[in-house]
């Protein structure tokens, strides 16, 4: 019987009597993959041409890490994907500059989670879709016009002039965006909230 590969972490499942003289190295690699999945950390630049996290059979791979820090400045709406068959949890730090673009974390052909700039996430993949378990919403400084995602917490500085913040285009019930007058300048240089054709509750 030949070796096989596990569905999610792509571990090498060794068949009885196989791999004479090499089973130790295969076992060590499996242990390194498990270490990645339990507590591994990697940084992934989303502006690279390849935005699919890798799951190489029988080898350590960036998509097998538990913690992934996403970096880079978006020039368009982007998606980071994992293979459809993977069942796994992730801790995601979104350190990207969205530059008024969107970033989604999903399976190759399923649904996923729209990530808000500056926030951190606990996600899981059920082998079909990526689901959000929790979101840590972090305050970040803004001093220029921007279109934001639900969950944004903005320290808005209008010291250099008025600023317009445009809300998400397709809001859902319960979505929130928070603003703070960082420099106490709203009375002089206004913050304008663009509704994006939706109603606002405050």
Where do the language-model regions lie?
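Glycine-rich, low-complexity segments
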Residues: 1-8, 16, 22, 28-64, ...
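Acidic, glycine/polar-enriched metal-coordinating patches/loops
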Residues: 2-9, 71-137, 157-202
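Generic alpha-helical scaffold signal
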Residues: 21, 61-62, 84, 171
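Extracellular ectodomain segments of secreted/surface proteins
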Residues: 62-73
């Amino acid at each position: 019987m030949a070796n096989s590969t596990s569905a999610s972490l792509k571990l090498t499942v060794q068949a009885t009597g196989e791999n004479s003289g090499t089973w130790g190295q295969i076992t060590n690699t499996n242990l390194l993959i498990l270490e990645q999945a339990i507590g591994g950390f990697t940084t992934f630049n989303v502006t690279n041409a390849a935005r699919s996290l890798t799951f190489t059979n029988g080898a350590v791979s960036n998509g097998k890490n538990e913690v992934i820090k996403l970096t880079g400045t978006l020039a368009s709406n982007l998606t980071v994907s994992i293979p459809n068959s993977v069942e796994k949890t992730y801790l995601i730090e979104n350190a990207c500059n969205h530059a008024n673009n969107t970033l989604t974390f999903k399976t190759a052909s399923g649904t996923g989670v729209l990530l808000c700039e500056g926030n951190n996430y606990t996600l899981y993949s059920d082998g079909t879709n990526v689901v959000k378990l929790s979101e840590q919403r972090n305050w970040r400084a803004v001093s220029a016009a921007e279109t934001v995602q639900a969950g944004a917490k903005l320290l808005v500085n209008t010291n250099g002039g008025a600023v317009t913040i445009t809300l998400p285009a397709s809001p859902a019930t319960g979505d929130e965006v928070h603003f703070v007058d960082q420099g106490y300048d709203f009375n002089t240089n206004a913050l304008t909230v663009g509704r994006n054709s939706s109603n606002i509750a405050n």
